[in-house]
């Protein structure tokens, strides 16, 4: 994958931080950081598609992360798709200004290191913060921590919900924290754009060696979070324009099309129980839309936590229904057992049972499958 961040946004961020640091004593700059690691292994246990599919993957196979084209292929134990290592560093310039960067090396991208975050934070008031640079798109509950395996119960997040062409953006966001009665609230508004060159997401549909750029421009959105005791709720709306550049065909950039996304999350943790639900709806002009949802229930038994998850994806198409790539539909039922080794490390075992109800193209290339994965996660 080539450069996946905006030079302009990073230069602006660095210039802003450098200018601020010149007005502060060098000794006042405080550097902190934390690392994270996931070592994962998986094996395909079965599936209905045999041999190399039309996109170059050896099947039976199963997608664990659409955004990174993380796919477990048949032929023994695979370590690449979900393994990763990363580091997040922060430089605090003064009480008002800090700068954060995060780099991640993924097995799904053959160890290539990408700069996922690079943003500055300026505290306007104790409740309000302006951030600028490169950040995660806040599409889901675990969006900000989706690279940190220790932060969530699964070996890999439910691919039916956590899987889109773009996961980051370059721009601005304004965070405001407050209270609504006894409830804590956070309002996050954001604007920006994303250009993802040689987008791995497109490999799944066009092939491992086929190059397509993805652009989301004129991004504007907001998310609102409420929390009280063991209840957390979240709603999100985002709109943008989207287009692709089919490099290998030589057709260039396609026309920009408007898209809208609505998301909602609910997290409940009464006593030792963990219950979560997420959904995302999309609408794209001259295309149709998508529906994605997942529901999980688990329970803590001291250091152990078993969990079951049902995740669904449905593609709703209103044009060009003869296109064999359209109308993708599938359900994944997963069983996870997590054991916390320490306060900063765990091991997990996950069994996925992927059931496909898609069009002939997707069914003949991916179909249904069973996948067993195990991981060791830690933060340091």
Feature locations, PLM:
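Outer membrane beta-barrel
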Residues: 30-32, 40, 74-194, 225-228, ...
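Outer-membrane beta-barrel pore domains
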Residues: 121-123, 143-145, 235-380
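Residues that define the transmembrane beta-barrel architecture of outer-membrane proteins
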Residues: 79-85, 112-116, 166-170, 216-220, ...
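Bacterial N-terminal signal peptides that target proteins for export
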Residues: 2-12
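Flexible, solvent-exposed coil segments and beta strand-coil junctions
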Residues: 63-68, 94-100, 106, 148-156, ...
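Signature for the C-terminal beta-barrel architecture of outer-membrane proteins
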Residues: 30, 60-61, 124-130, 165-304
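Transmembrane beta-strand segments of Gram-negative outer membrane beta-barrel proteins
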Residues: 28-67
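N-terminal signal peptide c-region/cleavage motif recognized by signal peptidases
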Residues: 18, 23-25
């Amino acid at each position: 994958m080539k450069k996946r961040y905006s030079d302009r946004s990073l230069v602006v961020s660095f210039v802003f931080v450098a200018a601020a640091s010149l007005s502060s004593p060098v000794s006042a700059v405080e550097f902190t950081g934390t690392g994270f690691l996931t070592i994962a292994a998986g094996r395909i246990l079965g599936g209905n598609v045999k041999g190399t599919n039309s996109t170059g993957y050896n099947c039976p196979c199963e997608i664990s992360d659409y955004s990174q084209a993380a796919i477990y292929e048949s032929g023994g134990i695979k370590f690449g798709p979900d393994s990763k290592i990363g580091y997040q560093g922060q430089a605090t310039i003064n009480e008002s200004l800090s700068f954060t960067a995060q780099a991640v090396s993924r097995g799904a991208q053959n160890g290539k290191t990408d700069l996922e975050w690079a943003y500055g934070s300026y505290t306007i008031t104790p409740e309000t913060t302006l951030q600028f640079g490169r950040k995660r798109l806040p599409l889901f509950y675990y969006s900000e921590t989706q690279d940190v395996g220790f932060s969530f119960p699964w070996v890999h997040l439910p691919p039916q919900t956590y899987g889109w062409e773009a996961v980051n953006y370059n721009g601005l966001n304004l965070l405001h924290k407050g209270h609504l009665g006894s409830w804590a609230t956070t309002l996050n508004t954001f604007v920006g754009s994303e250009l993802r060159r040689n987008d791995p997401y497109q490999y799944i549909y066009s092939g491992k060696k086929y190059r397509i750029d993805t652009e989301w421009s004129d991004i504007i959105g907001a998310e609102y979070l409420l929390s009280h005791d063991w209840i957390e709720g979240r709603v999100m709306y985002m709109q943008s324009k989207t287009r692709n550049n089919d490099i290998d065909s030589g057709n260039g950039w396609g026309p920009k099309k408007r898209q809208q996304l609505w998301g909602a999350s609910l997290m409940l943790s009464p006593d030792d129980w963990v219950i979560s639900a997420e959904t995302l709806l999309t609408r794209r002009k001259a295309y149709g839309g998508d529906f994605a949802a997942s529901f999980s229930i688990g329970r803590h038994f001291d250091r152990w936590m078993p969990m079951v998850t049902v995740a669904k994806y449905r593609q709703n198409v209103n044009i060009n229904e003869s296109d064999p790539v359209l109308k993708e539909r599938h359900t994944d039922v997963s069983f996870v057992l997590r054991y916390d080794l320490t306060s900063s490390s765990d091991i997990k075992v996950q069994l996925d049972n992927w059931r496909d109800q898609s069009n002939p193209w997707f069914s003949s290339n991916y179909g249904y499958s069973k996948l067993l994965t195990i991981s060791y996660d830690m933060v340091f």
